[in-house]
UniProtKB/Swiss-Prot annotation:
The lineage of its organism: Bacteria, Pseudomonadati, Pseudomonadota, Alphaproteobacteria, Rhodobacterales. The chain crosses the membrane at residues 7-27, 46-66, 80-100, 111-131, 157-177, 183-203, 244-264, 273-293, 305-325. The gene is nuoH1. GO terms for biological process: aerobic respiration. NDH-1 is composed of 14 different subunits. Subunits NuoA, H, J, K, L, M, N constitute the membrane sector of the complex. It comes from Cereibacter sphaeroides (strain ATCC 17029 / ATH 2.4.9). HAMAP family: NDH1_NuoH (MF_01350). This is NADH-quinone oxidoreductase subunit H 1. It is an enzyme of class 7 (translocase).
Amino acid sequence: MNSGMGIILTIAAQGLLVIAFVMISLLFLVYGDRKIWAAVQLRRGPNVVGAFGLLQTVADAAKYIFKEVVVPAGVDRPVFFLAPLISFVLAVLAWAVIPFSPGWVLSDINVAILFVFAASSLEVYGVIMGGWASNSKYPFLGSLRSAAQMISYEVSLGLIIIGIIISTGSMNLSHIVEAQDGAFGLFNWYWLPHLPMVALFFISALAETNRPPFDLPEAESELVAGFQVEYSSTPFLLFMAGEYIAIFLMCALMSLLFFGGWLSPIPGLPDGVFWMVAKMAFFFFLFAMVKAIVPRYRYDQLMRIGWKVFLPFSLGWVVLVAFLAKFEVFGGFWARWAMGG
């Protein structure tokens, strides 16, 4: 009995550490996003609350929490309040299987990629529920856009990940990182043999997380604020937090799948969690820069790219990877390169 309680307490403590990391990272993500956007527009950004404005995000969070929760007439109250909670919880849940270093993972399961993909796919239900429960046409249109958009690009993301699974022979994220270890540092990582898929994964991640230039579910110029129109205070904060956590999750997946996770890019330097966090921060910087400099796509353009460009290309890449790996084309060179064989 004591042993079982000890295991439960250990898991609970590890879970709290993961949640603490995600929530602390969230503060810096919002701050960094605003600072980068301000720098591109030749503004100063947050600079009043705390040193260099570092506590501005804390002040904004406190403001949201203590504001009145305004509930419009005619909404479905249980679903209205459940929707942001679903989006937030599912975004945090996926971090349970993200490894930061050998042994630094809450649950090192052999179907980690499938778990992350399932959790991120279910987030769309929070958006749909929020749009439908608001009893307003603008949130409902935004939620429908979100559903179509996420379904369209999840297919491409899944096919891209299948190529990595074929190369590794495992869906365990730790095994995928270990398969990229080698004497040539960053040239052993999967970004090189899977180079076309790196760009596709990055763009699909933007669309999957409703990030500019694909933020059509909350297009201010068309739908006011999309599915978030009727939300205020803490429910709105949960939606926003879930979005940023999902973005950071995509940064972690890019680091693990293509860029060696915690592996050092330079042979001889020690591996560790520092490299993992640094890579995630770099990819978030790219996300923020795209938001600041790329104009929003039209909805028909977004759907056309997803179904007529990304889907055929990613499907063809899976077939090519499987063919090269199975039949040892080029004397098995590609298989040895991508699989460490």
